[in-house]
Amino acid sequence: MVNVLKGVLIECDPAMKQFLLYLDEANALGKKFIIQDIDDTHVFVIAELVNVLQERVGELMDQNAFSLTQK
């Protein structure tokens, strides 16, 4: 029997990949979303969760960014 899943290949740096692996292990999106961990910079994820992943990555980037007015 063949199971077919629609997915998206994501290329990122190793640090971002570790964040994605953390989200996957913690079931932060309600279910596992990584279909295949390919190598150091690539993961294959469920296509329907890509928008949610982009939001989570955006939140992480906002937390790590500093504005010029902050001291």
From Swiss-Prot:
Localization per Swiss-Prot or TrEMBL: Nucleus; Cytoplasm
One Gene Ontology CC term in the entry: transcription factor TFIIH core complex
Main location: nucleus
GO BP term (any one): nucleotide-excision repair
Keyword Iron attached: no
Listed InterPro entries: TFB5-like_sf (IPR035935), TFIIH_TTDA/Tfb5 (IPR009400)
Gene3D superfamilies assigned to the protein according to its UniProt record, in alphabetical order: TFB5-like (3.30.70.1220)
Family recorded in the similarity comment: Belongs to the TFB5 family.
Stated role: Component of the general transcription and DNA repair factor IIH (TFIIH) core complex, which is involved in general and transcription-coupled nucleotide excision repair (NER) of damaged DNA and, when complexed to CAK, in RNA transcription by RNA polymerase II. In NER, TFIIH acts by opening DNA around the lesion to allow the excision of the damaged oligonucleotide and its replacement by a new DNA fragment. In transcription, TFIIH has an essential role in transcription initiation.
Binding partners and assembly: Component of the 7-subunit TFIIH core complex composed of XPB/ERCC3, XPD/ERCC2, GTF2H1, GTF2H2, GTF2H3, GTF2H4 and GTF2H5, which is active in NER. The core complex associates with the 3-subunit CDK-activating kinase (CAK) module composed of CCNH/cyclin H, CDK7 and MNAT1 to form the 10-subunit holoenzyme (holo-TFIIH) active in transcription.
Name of the molecule in the record: General transcription factor IIH subunit 5
Lineage: Eukaryota, Metazoa, Chordata, Craniata, Vertebrata
Gene name in the database record: Gtf2h5
